[in-house]
Structures are given as structure tokens and as C-alpha cells.
């Protein structure tokens, strides 16, 4: 899907920033203005998030994340070799071409992230080594699980845990490039997705490392434990994705529903509901929706993308409006929705929680963070802060 477009000065071509079937930025693409072909990918292998043309139409410029760092690149049109033009520990976000083609303007700075535990006494930083992401609290709030990036993003992304009382950290799954995971309610097993090039596979492993990880499903992502020895995940197709379920031993693969989805979110603790997102029409999923795993009934939560999580006891729903599973921001807010009658009895605003008025949200607890993981109650949670601190610079072009 195309997100941003930059027409060439001669109006013959368009440089496009696009995402794949799971919402991940891909290489940029150049397509003809007349639409007679799908065009071709350009720039380096990586996540292209911005582009520009030189005024004379000879060069294309890209803002691309490669190996975990975002820099500026250029390529002679139409099929030259990509060249990196910025280097070093700082990164660049965004680019704009000067009117005379002699310089680029970009935001140059550094990315910073921190992890905090919140409890009734306040916020407490968690000292961890390495680049940490996807932190989650155990159901009892005593242990923290998280991913640690080793080297750059093409190397291993490992699963670790930390005992919050003793401060002791342990490696649980190493030597893999893990992009998402879920811990079983009894904290005995883990299911996780590994990224290998353009493909992704789901594995299952005991947390005591008594057995090696076992391959469960190919072309799959966003795995969660689904109760009764099952795993729920998003099955990736050529053009569409589906919500699927499989036994933890790899048997009994089945679709939960036939409607295609764009992404999968959380599964309720009782495995009765799963949250999915989509942009379909007619009978397809639209917005952010909870789907019953029993009778396929639906409950609309947000009109657009939202990140949704349940508390471990299922009594609260945590909803972060305006974000998706792959494009989270540390700003914004998370709504804590009480579920005294469970998900089936929940009442959501007709326009969705992302468009709710102050009156419709009266009495709802608001957490002033987007990247959170619920704890055993609304007063206990873990949150991540992530920010890019930079200033605008002019980059001369020679």
C-alpha cells in the first residue's frame, strides 16, 4: 500500500513510499505517471520512509532505515546504484530538497528510549543493557519480559526476563531475530515470531530451555496463546491475511473467520475474544474490532487503528487510540476501560473510542503513555518512552 508520493519534476514518474501486507515499510518504488506498470523498487534494501527528486530529474533521494539506523541515500534515476550520503551515530528523519538542488534539509539527531515501572508510589526506571523493546509484565507483576537487540537489527533480537525483586536478568531465547512474542499464562512456555528476510515463522518453546524451539507455522505473525493448548495468529497470504488458530504441537490449523484482516492485536485472558484491525468493506473487518472466537460475533472498539490489551484477569481493557501494532508512539494516551460484565457486555461509543467525546469518556482512567503493558491492576504497569531529539540541518550536495 502506498503512503507518500513524490512526483518527478518532469511529471513522468512518481516516487512512492509503501508498506507490505503487514504494515511494514519497504523499499521505495518508482511508478510511471500513466499507471501502465507497477514500476520497480529503488534505493537500498531497507525501510524507506521518505523521498525526494533533484530539480533536474537526475537523482532520487531516500530516507531509509538499514540495519537499525536511519540515514539518507541517493540513486541516479532511473536504475543507478544506491549510495549512502550520511553516516555516523546520529540519524536523519525526513528530507526536503532545496529549490536549486544544491542541498537537502533534514532533521538530524539521536533516538532515545527508556523503560519504567509504574506503581502507586510513582514511576521507577528499569536499568537494562542494550536496545530494549516490547516489554511486558507477568500476570502477577513480579517479572518483566522484553526483547533485546544484539548488534544491529539484522542480528539477533533475543527474549529476556527480569525478576523485579532481585533485579536478576535471564536470557530465555537467544540466537533468533524475534519480532513479537507471547508468554503462556503459567509462564512455562513462549510462542514467538522470527523474521528471516521477507518471511516470518512462529516457534514454540519451554521457558526453562529444556527443549529447543519448535517450528509451528510458516508465513505467520502476531502470535498469542489461545487457551486449551492452542495458538492464535495472523496467517499471511499472497494478497490478504487471515485470523488463524493452531495447536501448540503444529497440528489442527484452521481459520477462525473467512474475512481478511490487516493486523492482529491481543487475545483476551479467557481466549473468548481476539482483537483485529482492517480496512475492508462490506463484510470485511474495518477499524479495530474484537471478534468472538466462539461465534464470530464482533464488537467495534475503534473506527481507526488502536492498540488494545487486556489486564491479566480480564477486568480491564487498555486502548491506545491512533496507533498500530507496528507504528507505536510514546506520546498520546491509553484509556483504561472497566469490564464489569465482560467483553460481551461492554458499551463502546458508536464512533469508536478513538473519536469519543469527553462526555462519553467520563469516569474512564487515562494513562498519559502509549507504549504500556498492563500489570495486575490499573495502578501497576510498565511503559516505554521513545523520542527522537534533533534539529534541522542543511546537507550540501556535491
State where each predicted segment sits.
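Sequence signature of WD/YWTD-type beta-propeller architectures
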Residues: 1-398
Amino acid at each position: 500500500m502506498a503512503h507518500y508520493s513524490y512526483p518527478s519534476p518532469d511529471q513522468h514518474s512518481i516516487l512512492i513510499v509503501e508498506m507490505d501486507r503487514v504494515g511494514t515499510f519497504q523499499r521505495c518504488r518508482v511508478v510511471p505517471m500513466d499507471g501502465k506498470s507497477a514500476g520497480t523498487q529503488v534505493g537500498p534494501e531497507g525501510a524507506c520512509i521518505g523521498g525526494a527528486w533533484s530539480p533536474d530529474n537526475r537523482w532520487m533521494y531516500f530516507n531509509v532505515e538499514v540495519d537499525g539506523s536511519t540515514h539518507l541515500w541517493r540513486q541516479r534515476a532511473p536504475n543507478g546504484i544506491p549510495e549512502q550520503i550520511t553516516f555516523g551515530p546520529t540519524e536523519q528523519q525526513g528530507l526536503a530538497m532545496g529549490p536549486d538542488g544544491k542541498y537537502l534539509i533534514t532533521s538530524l539527531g539521536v533516538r532515545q528510549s527508556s523503560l519504567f515501572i509504574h506503581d502507586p508510589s510513582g514511576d521507577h526506571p528499569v536499568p537494562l543493557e542494550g536496545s530494549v523493546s516490547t516489554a511486558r509484565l507477568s500476570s502477577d507483576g513480579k517479572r518483566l519480559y522484553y526483547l533485546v537487540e544484539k548488534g544491529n537489527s539484522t542480528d539477533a533480537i533475543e527474549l529476556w526476563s527480569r525478576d523485579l525483586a532481585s533485579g536478576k536478568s535471564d536470557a530465555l531465547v537467544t540466537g533468533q531475530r524475534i519480532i513479537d512474542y507471547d508468554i503462556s499464562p503459567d509462564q512455562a512456555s513462549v510462542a514467538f515470531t522470527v523474521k528471516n528476510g521477507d518471511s516470518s515463522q512462529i516457534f514454540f518453546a519451554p521457558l526453562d530451555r529444556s527443549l529447543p524451539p519448535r517450528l509451528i507455522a510458516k508465513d505467520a505473525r502476531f502470535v498469542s496463546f489461545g487457551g486449551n493448548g492452542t495458538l492464535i495468529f495472523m496467517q499471511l497470504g499472497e494478497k490478504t491475511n487471515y485470523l488463524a488458530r493452531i495447536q501448540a504441537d503444529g497440528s489442527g490449523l484452521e481459520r477462525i473467520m473467512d474475512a481478511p484482516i490487516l493486523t492482529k492485536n491481543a487475545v483476551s485472558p479467557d481466549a473468548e475474544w481476539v482483537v483485529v484491525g482492517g480496512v475492508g468493506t462490506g463484510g470485511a473487518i474495518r477499524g479495530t474490532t474484537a471478534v468472538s472466537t466462539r461465534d464470530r460475533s464482533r464488537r467495534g472498539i475503534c473506527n481507526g487503528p488502536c492498540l488494545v490489551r487486556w489486564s491479566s484477569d480480564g477486568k480491564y481493557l487498555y486502548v491506545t487510540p491512533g496507533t498500530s501494532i507496528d507504528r507505536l508512539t510514546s506520546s498520546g494516551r491509553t484509556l483504561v476501560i472497566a469490564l464489569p460484565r465482560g467483553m460481551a457486555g461492554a458499551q463502546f461509543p458508536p464512533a469508536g473510542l478513538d473519536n469519543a467525546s469527553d462526555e462519553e469518556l467520563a469516569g474512564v482512567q487515562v494513562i498519559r503513555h502509549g507504549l504500556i503493558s498492563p500489570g495486575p491492576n490499573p495502578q501497576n504497569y510498565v511503559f516505554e518512552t521513545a523520542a527522537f531529539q534533533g534539529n534541522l540541518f542543511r546537507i550540501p550536495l556535491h
